């Protein structure tokens, strides 16, 4: 289940996470990863066939007609380049929706002027609403597999804010 840590090291309670999420229109839910995907998700990298298998095992969401699977792993040649890109603070015109299937990551958000880190792992489903400044960082393991949902193609474009990572 997702955890929220503030810059001062304090961990938010479940009630605080719910209140903060509601106030900032962030959705944080737990949606179990289908057990049938365990063997496929255990692979470090996935080819197109394996990625399609993963996507086919998850129910489509009509409100998000487009989706793909992002796989970051140390064995991926451009892993650090992609990870660094996501670390830059940015916002989107559309919602950023992720369902974490394997690995872990950290969504940084600004909550009432204070930076907070939302740690996500397998089964966590998060929606960062359009316009909310955020970033994303990998954990020390440097790996994650997540479905990215999109309601419109323009939503993928990031507007970088220049805030220091």
UniProtKB/Swiss-Prot annotation:
Its EC number is 1.13.11.54, 1.13.11.53. Ni(2+) binds at residues 90, 92, 96, 134. Keywords: Amino-acid biosynthesis, Dioxygenase, Iron, Metal-binding, Methionine biosynthesis, Nickel, Oxidoreductase. Pathway: Amino-acid biosynthesis; L-methionine biosynthesis via salvage pathway; L-methionine from S-methyl-5-thio-alpha-D-ribose 1-phosphate: step 5/6. Its cofactor is Fe(2+); Ni(2+). GO terms for biological process: L-methionine salvage from methylthioadenosine; L-methionine salvage from S-adenosylmethionine. Fe(2+) binds at residues 90, 92, 96, 134. It comes from the Bacteria. It catalyses: 1,2-dihydroxy-5-(methylsulfanyl)pent-1-en-3-one + O2 = 3-(methylsulfanyl)propanoate + CO + formate + 2 H(+); 1,2-dihydroxy-5-(methylsulfanyl)pent-1-en-3-one + O2 = 4-methylsulfanyl-2-oxobutanoate + formate + 2 H(+). Binds 1 Fe(2+) cation per monomer. The record marks 98 as: Important to generate the dianion. The record marks 95 as: May play a role in transmitting local conformational changes. Signal peptide: none annotated. GO terms for molecular function: acireductone dioxygenase (Ni2+-requiring) activity; acireductone dioxygenase [iron(II)-requiring] activity; iron ion binding; nickel cation binding. Belongs to the acireductone dioxygenase (ARD) family. Catalyzes 2 different reactions between oxygen and the acireductone 1,2-dihydroxy-3-keto-5-methylthiopentene (DHK-MTPene) depending upon the metal bound in the active site. Fe-containing acireductone dioxygenase (Fe-ARD) produces formate and 2-keto-4-methylthiobutyrate (KMTB), the alpha-ketoacid precursor of methionine in the methionine recycle pathway. Ni-containing acireductone dioxygenase (Ni-ARD) produces methylthiopropionate, carbon monoxide and formate, and does not lie on the methionine recycle pathway. Monomer. This is Acireductone dioxygenase. It comes from Rhodopseudomonas palustris (strain TIE-1).
């Amino acid at each position: 289940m997702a955890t929220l840590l503030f810059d001062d090291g304090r961990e938010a309670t479940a009630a605080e996470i719910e209140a903060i999420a509601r106030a900032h229109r962030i959705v944080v839910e737990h949606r179990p990863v289908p057990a049938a995907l365990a063997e496929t998700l255990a692979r470090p990298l996935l080819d197109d066939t394996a990625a399609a298998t993963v996507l086919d095992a998850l129910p489509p969401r009509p409100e998000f007609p487009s989706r793909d699977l992002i796989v970051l792993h140390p064995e991926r040649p451009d892993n650090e380049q992609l990870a660094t890109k996501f670390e830059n603070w940015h916002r989107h015109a559309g919602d950023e929706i992720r369902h974490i299937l394997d690995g872990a990551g950290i969504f940084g958000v600004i909550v009432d002027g204070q930076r907070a880190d939302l740690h996500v792992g397998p089964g966590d489903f998060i929606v960062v609403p359009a316009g909310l400044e955020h970033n994303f960082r990998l954990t020390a393991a440097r790996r994650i597999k997540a479905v990215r949902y999109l309601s419109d193609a323009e939503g993928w474009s990031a507007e970088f804010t220049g805030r220091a990572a």
